[in-house]
Amino acid sequence: IAAPRPAESSPPPPASSVPVGDVDTALTSKSGQNSQEPQAPTTDQVDPAAVVTIVVQLDEAADRAASLASINEAVAGVFPGSSAQVEREYDKALKGFALSAPAGSLDAIRAVSGVSAAFLEREIPVNDTATLNDEGGIEAPRLASQNPDNLSAQLIMHADQLTQKGEGKVIAVIDTGVEMTHPAFSGTMRSTPALTAESVAALAPRLGAGKTGVYVSEKFPFAYDYADNDPDASPTGEAGSHGTHVAGITAGNAGEIVGIAPDAQIIVAKVARSSNGGIPDSALLAALDDMVVLRPDVINLSLGQTGGMDNEADSMYATVFKSLQQAGVTVNAAA
C-alpha cells in the first residue's frame, strides 16, 4: 500500500512499460528508489581463481557441444589446466548452462562465439520479516472483532463473489517450499484435476533438473527441491514458511482458511537452499526451465527481485519469461 502524497505534490510520471522480454533499464522500485536486490558479483569482487557458478546463455543457433568446448578452451587460456564443469543444463525456457569455473574466466567466457550472455551467480537472501518501516508499508486499520488468523483471502479480495474457484487450473509456487501437510490444504478437490499421477509420470522424462520430482496428491501434483536436487520440497527454517504462506493465499482449501483459487492445483518448486535459505540463480532458472514442460496456468514468484532489467542476469530472466509467455504460462513476479 503506497503512502498518500501531500496535496500540493505533482503526480509522478507514468511508469515505463515494455513488452515481455524487452529490457527497461529505467525501472525503479515503488518508492522511486533503486532496489537493493543483489546484483551479479563482478570479477573484481571475487578472487579470480575461486571456482564459482557462472550462468551462461547461448545464442539459439549455437551448437551446445561446440560452445562448451570453446568455453573450456577459453577458461584454460586464462587459467591453464582449468576447465568449466557443467552443473546444470537449460534447454527449454533458455538455452545454456550453469557452469563451475574460475571467477576470473567470466570475460573470456563472454567472448566465446555463440555465448550471448554470462554472469556470476547471485544468491538471493530470504527474509520473511516485515516492519511498518519497510518500503511503502503503512499500518492497516483492524476491527476489534477481526481474527486475522481466520480471515479468508477470498473475502479480502472479493473473490467469493466469483463463480470460478480455480477449477482445472494449475498454479506453480516457485518459492521456499510448501508445508504440504498443513491444515490449510486439507480440503477436498471439487473438480477434475488438470494434472494426474499418470500425466505427471508421462511428463517426467522431458523434465530437466526435476526428473525425480514427485506426485504428492491431487492438490500437489508435482513437488521438487531445485536448490538441493531432491524430491523433498518441504520448507526449512523460519523464513522457509514464506512459500507455505503464498500457497495458502493462492489456493488454500480448508474450512476458514480459503485461498483465492481453492480448487486449483499447486506445483511446488522449492528454490531455497535448506542449509541457509538462499536462492541461487541456477536453481531458480532450473525450476523455470521445467515449467515449459509442466505448463502451469500461472507461476507465482514472490522472491523480492526488482523488475529493473539493468544487467545481464535480469536480461536473461527476461528471455525466460518471454519463453514461458509463448508457452501459454502467465508469470506473476512480485518485486
Regions found by a protein language model. Give the residues of each.
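Catalytic-core segments of hydrolase enzymes
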Residues: P296-A335
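Short glycine-/aliphatic-rich beta-strand segments at the starts of folded cytosolic domains
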Residues: A50-D59
